[in-house]
């Protein structure tokens, strides 16, 4: 027979997995709804603007660590990795 502690751990793990999957599903904005063939020009204009906005959100450029190439990971300069904080700057004092 399975102990209550194991059951509780399995339940906690499954709840965490469900929550993580739920968070991942909402990572992208929802696609705009097509107004159909009988839509008025105003509805079509709103739909096209919503599609443009959706495409701009989905295809926006991401900067930072994603822009690094494998060569930069291997052959990076250690001096560039030095982190400076605002209070450590001697010009402030």
UniProtKB/Swiss-Prot annotation:
Q: Name one GO molecular function term.
A: neuropeptide Y receptor binding
A GO CC term assigned to this protein in UniProt: extracellular space
Indicate where this protein resides in the cell. Secreted
Q: Which PROSITE patterns match?
A: PANCREATIC_HORMONE_1, PANCREATIC_HORMONE_2
Signal peptide location: 1-27
Gene3D superfamilies associated with the record: 6.10.250.900
User: Short name of one Pfam family for this protein?
Assistant: Hormone_3
Residues modified as Tyrosine amide: 63
Q: Which family does it belong to?
A: Belongs to the NPY family.
Please give the name of this protein: Peptide YY-like
What organism is this sequence from?
Lampetra fluviatilis
């Amino acid at each position: 027979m399975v102990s209550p502690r194991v059951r509780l751990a399995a339940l906690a793990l499954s709840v965490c997995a469900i929550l993580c999957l739920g968070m991942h599903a909402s990572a992208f904005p929802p696609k705009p709804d097509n107004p159909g063939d009988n839509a008025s020009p105003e509805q079509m204009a709103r739909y096209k603007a919503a599609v443009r906005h959706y495409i701009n959100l989905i295809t926006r450029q991401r900067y930072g660590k994603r822009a690094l190439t494998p060569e930069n990971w291997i052959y990076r300069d250690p001096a560039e990795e030095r982190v400076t904080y605002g209070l450590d700057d001697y010009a402030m004092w």
